[in-house]
Amino acid sequence: MDYTIIDAHAHLWLRQDTVVDGFPIRTLDNGRSLFMGEIRQMVPPFMMDGVNSAEVFLSNMDYAQVAAAVITQEFIDGIQNEYLAEVISRYPDRFFVCGMCEFRKPGFLAQAKELIARGFKAIKIPAQRLLLTEGRVMLNSEEMMQMFRYMEERDVMLSIDLADGATQVPEMQEVIQECPRLRIAIGH
């Protein structure tokens, strides 16, 4: 049987250095990171500097006969757009890369437009992280809907992870109704 293998969910980063829900996330050594109050093995220990680079990932993809990978993002990785723009330009046939905006505060529409102009073919929203203690960022807010319409007009995919349960389902129903041609991939 002849088929192509695609890794549908992978992450790349140069360094983890962020704060999520009040917890720091930092690259340590030997592939470990301080992660939400615990030390976790984020990459194999031979990746001593904690860098999860495209080159190491490609080496593993080649070994496993994986043709291409979808590179997603999450706030826990830190926003990696600068590095991932380089990955897009260096390996356009191996990686389908999602850009990510700072959705936890206003102004992300301009960020999304810039990412799309830089060649990102998808925008990732880790929507489960938008249930903030200071108030929810609604998926059907005016700025979100403007962004979704902009993406739909340019055939840019939405990659989104939703909160557990049905909390954000009515908002997504509205997005789908308003933007029926918007391609949407819902992750875990």
Please provide the spans of the model-predicted regions.
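Catalytic pocket-lining loop regions of alpha/beta-barrel enzymes
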Residues: 122, 137-188
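Hydrophobic faces of well-ordered beta-strands that scaffold small-molecule active sites
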Residues: 6-10, 69-72, 95-99, 121-125, ...
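Short, well-structured secondary-structure segments
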Residues: 60, 65-80, 85, 92-102, ...
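Acidic-and-aromatic substrate-binding clefts and catalytic sites of carbohydrate-active enzymes
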Residues: 47-51, 73-80, 102-109, 130-139, ...
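A general structural detector for well-ordered alpha-helical segments in enzyme core domains, enriched
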Residues: 56-60, 80-87, 111-115, 143-147, ...
